[in-house]
Amino acid sequence: MIIGIGNDLCNIERIQRSLDRFGERFEQRVFTPHEIAKARGRRRVAETYAKRFAAKEAMAKALGTGVPRAGVHWKHLGVINLPSGKPGFELTGGAAARLAKLTPPGHRAVVHLTLTDDHPWAEAQVIIEAIPVAEPS
C-alpha cells in the first residue's frame, strides 16, 4: 500500500545563485557530507544539488511534514546512490522517526525515488510503499 507520495520542482539557477551568494554556508546547512562530496566531484554542481534539493522537498511532502518542520530537517533527508546508480534515501533523526510512525505494524517501508533535470529545472518524485513483512513459517 502507498503511505506517502511527494514531488518537487527546483530551479537550478536558483540553486546556483544560492551557491554563489552563500557558498559553503548553504551547502553545510542543507546537504549531508556525502551529498557535498558527490556534488563537488561532478562537472554540473548546481544541477546535482538541485536534484537533491528537490528530492528532499519531495520526501518531506511524502512524509507529510514539509521541511524544516515536525522535527524533520534538511540533513535528516540524505540522498544516496545505490551501487546500481539508482537514487535512494538515508533517513536519520526526525525523518526516520516520522517514517517509522507512518509505517503500519507488520509492514516495512520501501522508498522509491526518481530524479531528473532539464535546465533550468530539476525534478524529484517520491513514493513511500508499505510492504507486509512475511511471518516466519
Swiss-Prot record:
Requisite cofactors: Mg(2+)
Keywords (A to Z) from UniProt: Cytoplasm, Fatty acid biosynthesis, Fatty acid metabolism, Lipid biosynthesis, Lipid metabolism, Magnesium, Metal-binding, Transferase
Disulfide bonds: none
Ligand binding (Mg(2+)): D8, E57
Residues in coiled coil: none
One annotated GO biological process: fatty acid biosynthetic process
InterPro entries: 4-PPantetheinyl_Trfase_dom, 4-PPantetheinyl_Trfase_dom_sf, ACPS, Ppantetheine-prot_Trfase_dom
Places the protein is found: Cytoplasm
GO cellular-component term (any): cytoplasm
Gene Ontology terms for molecular function: holo-[acyl-carrier-protein] synthase activity; magnesium ion binding
EC number in record: 2.7.8.7
Top enzyme class: transferase
Catalytic reaction(s) noted: apo-[ACP] + CoA = holo-[ACP] + adenosine 3',5'-bisphosphate + H(+)
Function statement: Transfers the 4'-phosphopantetheine moiety from coenzyme A to a Ser of acyl-carrier-protein.
Family stated for the protein in its record: Belongs to the P-Pant transferase superfamily. AcpS family.
HAMAP family: AcpS
Protein name per its UniProtKB record: Holo-[acyl-carrier-protein] synthase
Origin species: Hyphomonas neptunium (strain ATCC 15444)
Gene behind the chain: acpS
